[in-house]
Amino acid sequence: MKTLIALAMLLYPAHPAYPAPPAYPALPAPPAHAAHAAQQPAKPQGKLFGTQDLGLLEAPDREQWQKPDQIMDAIGVAEGSKVAELGAAGGWFTLQLAERVGPNGRVFAEDIQRAMLDGIRRRMLAENLTNVTTVLGTTSDPRLPPGLDAALISDAFHEMDVDEDPQAVVKLLRNVALSLKPQGRLGIVDWTPGKGGPGPEAKNRVDPNRIIKAASAAGLQLIAREDFPPFIYLLVFGRANAKPTP
């Protein structure tokens, strides 16, 4: 039996594992007024990215293909900005945003899974960052504050756009639009249609035209599109009723 097991290990070596998400220190109990403490957990729709898979988002080469600085530049994230990330998951991009806006800025990290938000709070505590507020949203309302300079949905729209309720994502985007300043920007980053790369399988990738259609129905207009080969693309939206800056 031992010989058979050893032979199987030689013939079928283990696939190289993605790094596990870092272990962060335990958190003190959040204050009663914390943004997500008083909210009820949202009812998940479709297949959600679970906490057990967060290691997939921590690949050492992610910064190379995700292009966080270029994305933040495109949606106007600067020192002192007030921004939000929807579907923040493990907080990889939340960390990028928090470092960019600095101590005078504020990042609202939204997710519909409480466990994700707890992980983000631990991560920010470990990084000694105090400019991040977690927000427990729903599939149709991210519960964001008004006056945002920018909002970001990074590699998560394909999970928000579900067949069970096709209007939920339109309602979600409409609520984002209401939270933006007149000249605020929404960036949506998702996986280039087709196969390959670290993203979801081809059938779960979203054609950018589908996103543009949903955003238009939500009162947003496309301002710019940029492709970041080989894995992702970026769509930048503004409020359709916003008056141009003089």
Regions inferred by a protein language model and the residue ranges of each:
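Hydrophobic beta-strand segment of the Class I
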Residues: V83, A151-L152
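Core SAM-dependent methyltransferase catalytic element
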Residues: Q221-A224, F228-P246
